[in-house]
C-alpha cells in the first residue's frame, strides 16, 4: 500500500478515486508516573516522552488508514494529512488524525 502526502504519484497514474479514508490514534503520555523524565524532558528542550507518543500515534493512524483503504480495494492513499491534537497536556493524551483519498492505480 502506497501512502503519499502528494495528490499524485509520479509514474503511477490514478485510475479511480475511491473516496476519503480517515483514522485516528490516541496515545497516553504518562508524565505523572515518571516525574523525573518530565523534569528532564522539560529542561532538556525536547520531550522524548512526547516524541515517542507522537511517533507511535502517527504509526498507528497510518496503519489504520492503510487497513481502511484495503477495505475499498485501493492500491494507494494520496493527499495524506496528519493533524495532532493534545486535548490536555496535564491529562497526558495526544491524538493523531490521518486523512487521505483512497485510489486505484492503472
From Swiss-Prot:
InterPro entries: UPF0145_dom_sf, UPF0145_YbjQ-like. Transmembrane segments: none annotated. Pfam families: YbjQ_1 (PF01906). PANTHER family: UPF0145 PROTEIN YBJQ (PTHR34068:SF1). Belongs to the UPF0145 family. This is UPF0145 protein PP_2873.
Amino acid at each position: 500500500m502506497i501512502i503519499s502526502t502528494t495528490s499524485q504519484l509520479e509514474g503511477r497514474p490514478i485510475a479511480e478515486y475511491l473516496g476519503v479514508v480517515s483514522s485516528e490514534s490516541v496515545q497516553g503520555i504518562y508524565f505523572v508516573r515518571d516525574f523525573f523524565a518530565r523534569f528532564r524532558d522539560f529542561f532538556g528542550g525536547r520531550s522524548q516522552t512526547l516524541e515517542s507518543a507522537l511517533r507511535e500515534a502517527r504509526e498507528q493512524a497510518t496503519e489504520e488508514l492503510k487497513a481502511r483503504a484495503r477495505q475499498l480495494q485501493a492500491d494507494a492513499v494520496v493527499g495524506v494529512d496528519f493533524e495532532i491534537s493534545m486535548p490536555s497536556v496535564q491529562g497526558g493524551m495526544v491524538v493523531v488524525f490521518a486523512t487521505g483519498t483512497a485510489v486505484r492505480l492503472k
